[in-house]
Amino acid sequence: MTYPSELILGPPGCGKTHTLIEIVRDALSRGVEPDRIGYVSFTKKAVTEAVERAGSAFNLTPKSLPYFRTLHSLGYSGLGLSQSDLMAREDWKEFSRMMGMNFDGIIASDADDGLILPQGRDHDRYLRMIDRAALRCVTLGEEYNDQRNYDLDFFMLFKIWRGLQKYKSDYGKVSFTDMISGYVKQGSAPKLEILIVDEAQDLVPLQWKMVEVLAQNSDKTYFAGDDDQAIHRWAGVDVNLFMNCSQNVRTLKKSYRLPRSAYDLANSVVKRIHNRKQKAFDPMDREGTVNFHMDTHNLDMSQGSWTLMSRTNSFARDVAADLRDQGLFYEIKGYPSVKLEIAEAINIWEGLQKGREIGLHEVKRLYGLAPKTGDGAVIKRGIMPLLDAEPLDGTYTYESLVQNLGLLAQKETDALDMLRLGKDERYYIRALLRRNEVLTERPRLKVSTFHAMKGGEDDNVVVHLDSTKSCVTNPDQDDEHRV
């Protein structure tokens, strides 16, 4: 790579994003226009954080930062595409009909697990292999041999690839991967003074080619990431491209996330990675603690914020089930263990019991979840259409709902009896309420996979050490040590 560049290695918690925003700050202070600065990444999360931080620090709107984008978004806009150009569900149905096969059109991968997973239809596994070959910039034959998945037929693979190419050509359609490859082929890029490539260790070879197009038209390019956190090789990532992207290397030296005890444990694992860049950095000044437990029942999680991480989604679901059995409030993949609309309906009913007036939208929310037939009915059947005739700014009390809008429940009725709930869910919510959990707030306990939580932090972190046979027998154990 012949353009001016610098590789910024950011170990966990070393202020990588802060460092990159400072580069933006310096450029703006020198008079560089915001539309001459590019900030790209594979993930929307990284770009969104950069836009928010830059906008807050420099009073800039997202529109004034047109090149703070994901690579897919930049390809989409750079090629002048519209939504109608993309392969949609209707296209996959038509393609299925033409090929005499069944395709969902959903790439058979799971970024949380870090595994390639088959969907319900076997033919989608061929689509995944076709897509991964394009991302890795290898032939179908090379991809087929590398995966060693001989349950799939190579001649069928080639037939599907050829049919898909013809369909997209005939109907003028593109896939998400085509956005990247198309941008690389057209070869033009905006003139930038600064290009920042964040989380660069997660880029696949095709994305590196796109970055090359951008960097060739930029005065200075900064790559940022950490090869020790390159945990997406399953998706086609080649960490060597990251490690060799620039001759000028700067390592951030101080972690503001890792206490000494966690730092020492992490280093004992990192030393097992053979293919890595050596980097020395210091932990936080506080010691912290690392303890080993047989299971979560031995942990007192009644206070504080906790993240519980597992290797796969399946293990994460097992952890969530265990927390539920213990009567603990948690979220998994961002979803709370009690739906927010249920929690809000409980609050609405308890407000009515205390004499509070509620608005029409709250009436609709409560009524929508209330049983209207059978012995447990608390609302008259057929009352919902009448709510549409009510004034939008109307207010209601328990008494007015009984008199005018079909409320049957006694005022002392338990909030859980006001809702359609299964027996197990009823017991679970009652246990949470006994613990004085506030169900309308974000849970203190967060369940996740390692891949989904990458880059996150918490006061207390629980790491489940269970693994799978495919992980344990993986011939490249560098992947597992990084995870």
Regions found by a protein language model. Name each.
Residues 289-304:
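Conserved interdomain hinge at the start of the Helicase C-terminal
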Residues 63-80, 328-354:
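Conserved beta-strand -> loop -> alpha-helix junction used to position metal-binding or nucleic-acid-contacting
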Residues 32, 36, 57-65, 79-94, ...:
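Short, polar/flexible loop-turn hinges at active-site or ligand-entry regions and domain interfaces
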Residues 350-483:
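Conserved helicase C-terminal RecA-like lobe
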Residues 83-102, 243, 269-277, 346-383:
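A polyampholytic, Gly/Pro-enriched intrinsically disordered region
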